[in-house]
């Protein structure tokens, strides 16, 4: 029970290990878990390598992902750590947002240096908006030549800079997950140093409550004598009664004032992120608003139709399509609470996309949706999900 009482007092941070398969992500995850357990036994649970390595299958929006969740604490923070062992698992996890990361540890084997998958993971981390990367130069016990280690470190820093991260300033810590697991004091200290770097350099995440208010509209009602009420679950921010808001998406942006907030038939003074509530909107008729729009703090988000995205297309086994699709494919894009038809353009050189592939694409929606980079969506056909993606760049 000791665990529960710490949970509220410390910042909670989501991190993960990313990088090339066989560079030791899972071993390092197990080593972090063990080193922190040995250092702070009252704060941490004992986990062995096998329990992390046998990553359980999860289904996120119908997509099968093997992923391990490990919790641990330093003196400063409580961490939830995700480790997706396979390359395909990592890509699915990043694109579907199954596990959001506030920061990630890029694991690069000192014996190999950055490989093709290392590059792909760093690019994807930037596209889906992982705010911070730092580097664990793993298997450093196997490289005797200091100059070679310096060279690999330089290569990794250049890779980070080329993908829009701060390669000059990012901490690069030389570690050995395996030796730390075996209890070798020099390498146990290296893992402690790595976690000290994570504590210091990964910024505290901005909590949902501190972001600008946004509530997707799920339903619209008329209350006789009072006006129009929209219901939904507040995604982020807080909203006080008598605040001005904008209704964004599908139609031209409308401004209104929230004259009442209700939750479970009780009147509230404000709505908070995570709560299901009804908002009474001044001067709007039932036909002025619809499901799929969002109620937002004025000026915080804008409607768009054209964007670039990174998408994972479900395999046949996951209940996806049985055959490929080409440019000009017109499925539905499900954003928050509604489907909007869109036309897909595949990148140059990509003839078609097979079930089970991940791809970049450009999409033109027939109606505008309140959108920002990093927003997730599902691709649907006749009500069933055939893909999952994230907006990587807004075009118009």
From Swiss-Prot:
GTP binds at residues 19-26, 83-87, 138-141. InterPro entries: EF-Tu_GTP-bd (IPR041709), EF-Tu_GTPase (IPR050055), EFTu-like_2 (IPR004161), EFTU_2 (IPR033720), G_TR_CS (IPR031157), P-loop_NTPase (IPR027417), Small_GTP-bd (IPR005225), T_Tr_GTP-bd_dom (IPR000795). Residues 10-206 form the tr-type G domain. GO terms for cellular component: cytosol. Residues 19-26 are annotated as: G1. CDD domains: EF_Tu, EFTU_II, EFTU_III. Residues 176-178 are annotated as: G5. It is found in: Cytoplasm. The keyword Nucleotidyltransferase does not apply. Gene3D superfamilies: P-loop containing nucleotide triphosphate hydrolases (3.40.50.300), Translation factors (2.40.30.10). Residues 62-66 are annotated as: G2. It comes from the Bacteria. Residues 83-86 are annotated as: G3. Mg(2+) binds at residue 26. Residues 138-141 are annotated as: G4. It catalyses: GTP + H2O = GDP + phosphate + H(+). Keywords: Cytoplasm, Elongation factor, GTP-binding, Hydrolase, Magnesium, Metal-binding, Nucleotide-binding, Protein biosynthesis. Its EC number is 3.6.5.3. Belongs to the TRAFAC class translation factor GTPase superfamily. Classic translation factor GTPase family. EF-Tu/EF-1A subfamily. PANTHER family: ELONGATION FACTOR TU, MITOCHONDRIAL, ELONGATION FACTOR TU-RELATED. Monomer. GTP hydrolase that promotes the GTP-dependent binding of aminoacyl-tRNA to the A-site of ribosomes during protein biosynthesis. This is Elongation factor Tu.
């Amino acid at each position: 029970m000791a665990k529960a009482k710490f949970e509220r007092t410390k910042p909670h941070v989501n991190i993960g290990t990313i990088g090339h398969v066989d560079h030791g992500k899972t071993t390092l995850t197990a080593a972090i878990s063990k080193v922190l357990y040995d250092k702070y036994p009252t704060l941490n649970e004992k986990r062995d390598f096998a329990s992390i390595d046998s990553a359980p299958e999860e289904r996120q929006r119908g997509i099968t992902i093997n992923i391990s969740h490990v919790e641990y604490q330093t003196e400063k923070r409580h961490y939830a750590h995700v480790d997706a062992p396979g390359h395909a698992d990592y890509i699915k996890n990043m694109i579907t947002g199954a596990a959001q990361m506030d920061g990630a540890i890029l694991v690069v084997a000192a014996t190999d240096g950055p490989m093709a998958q290392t590059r792909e993971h760093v690019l994807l981390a930037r596209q889906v908006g992982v705010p911070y990367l730092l580097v664990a130069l793993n298997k450093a016990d196997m490289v005797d030549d200091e100059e070679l280690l310096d060279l690999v470190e330089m290569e990794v820093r250049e890779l980070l800079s080329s993908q829009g991260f701060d390669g000059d300033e990012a901490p690069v810590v030389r570690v050995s997950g395996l030796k730390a697991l075996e209890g070798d004091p020099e390498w146990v200290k290296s893992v402690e140093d790595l976690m000290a770097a994570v504590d210091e350099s990964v910024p505290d995440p901005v909590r949902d409550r501190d972001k600008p208010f946004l509530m997707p509209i799920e339903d619209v009602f008329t209350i006789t004598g009072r006006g129009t009420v929209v219901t939904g679950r507040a995604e982020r921010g807080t909203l006080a009664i008598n605040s001005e808001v904008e209704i964004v998406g599908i139609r031209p942006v409308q401004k209104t004032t929230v004259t009442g907030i209700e939750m479970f038939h009780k009147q509230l003074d404000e709505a908070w992120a995570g709560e299901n509530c009804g908002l009474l909107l001044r001067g709007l008729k039932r036909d002025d608003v619809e499901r799929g729009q969002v109620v937002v703090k004025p000026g915080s988000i804008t409607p768009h139709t054209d964007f670039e995205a990174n998408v994972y297309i479900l395999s046949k086994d996951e209940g996806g399509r049985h055959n490929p699709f080409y440019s000009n494919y017109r499925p539905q894009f499900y954003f928050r609470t509604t489907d909007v038809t869109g036309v897909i353009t595949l990148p140059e050189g990509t003839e078609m996309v097979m079930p089970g592939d991940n791809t970049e694409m450009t999409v033109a929606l027939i109606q505008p949706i309140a959108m920002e980079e990093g927003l997730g969506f599902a691709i649907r056909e006749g009500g069933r999900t055939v893909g999952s993606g994230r907006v990587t760049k807004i075009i118009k």
